[in-house]
């Protein structure tokens, strides 16, 4: 590494670089200098973040310096450790430096996208993450980004194709400074104003444009792809700045279903986004600096703010990883998937809640939400060879309440969904009584503020309600299409509705809610008809506009002929 840094380029090489820059756009604009190695992204290795990237580099001499730094990074500690772990021959690795014009995403947004679901390997969607400013914050895992799923089939059919939107906190962004000679001074991290945090960092039009590009790139390479993108805030254009093969789900056979099952539940300490589907337990080691990495022993649970490529040698020692920040496409998530280590990212306060030597169990086996429990809990691994399952003389449909589990369930032999309940969507994705959304202008200021915090990114409170139901139903329906998906309309009891935000204002106290105002009788009740109308509008949109006519509708708890 030092030898490369101290060596001189030949005058011929230097002149060729200068000439290329002048022909391209001149040296008065800024460039990104990035690595592209032959061993990067082999079928079972992502090499995520192993070599250097430099942003906002200006001038011939600075570009040449950074090219040399990229070459030298082939032999930094983390790259050597990664190759040793993967069994690659150091002499068989070749590397080039890629010089790209800098996209002004510091004035726009940027992110990562996969043409496959990173957690389940379901190939029918494009997963897109997005944040403000330069994409480094997402790749490094220093923000919790916005996250979207786009259905490939609906996109190809020219139907509304965005089936899921999750708002990330996006508290910071990276932008350029005036300096361009030193990488550390060429960019700076600033806070994102609160109003922007509460909005999505990319609009639907650009999301769909990105998803179309993902399909083109996937078709070109003939395999699932991992891509980085940037939206130029000056040009108002989207650029794809990197594409490489996805390295984890694409190599799984899909014939053996591995399922971890937690048998007991302890006290829930903290939650975040689950990476993978495994469970791990051990003693916490709270590490806030790379200097303290030596504290991690085999089998410890690594707890940190975020990881970067320097952490890779110790990540494989950990039984599990828990971070304060980051999304499903950050460095920690990619490496954890590759190593088969359960990880929970974006917990916000893990380094405050968890303490050194505290015994915990980290579970990624309960859906999209990963949970950290107190103590060492009992769990088991169940393995099923799907290829060996017998043909059955009956149709087997499954229950899917949580849309986030639909993609993993779709891999199990099935004949569709016999019951998709709206209660999970209303409880977990909405959390607000529908009447409070309809009567938003009449709410007191305190309740208004709480409702606004949840609905701010949507055109109106009622549109938030409709949209979340549309997203939940369309996720399940598009994943199982063309098999039937029977959606049961809401069947909360009055005491359950009262637990939603604002619910106590609208719900009666009933001695026996089990046979009270629920199901179809509630839909017909004058005080609830406008609430039920929003459900109907959502169902109609999914069937008529999105074309998901595999959705069947079930009316629950029908007690009379009139109902």
For the regions a language model picked out, list residue spans one by one.
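N-terminal beta-alpha lobe that positions the nucleotide/phosphoryl donor
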Residues: 1-98, 194-205, 210-212, 218-222, ...
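A structural-propensity feature for long, helix-poor, extended segments
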Residues: 1-9, 162-180, 347-377, 451-461
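Extended active-site and interfacial segments that coordinate phosphate-rich ligands
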Residues: 47-81, 105-179, 241-273, 317-324, ...
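Conserved catalytic alpha/beta cores of large enzymes that bind or transform nucleotide phosphates
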Residues: 125-226, 231-232, 272-281, 304, ...
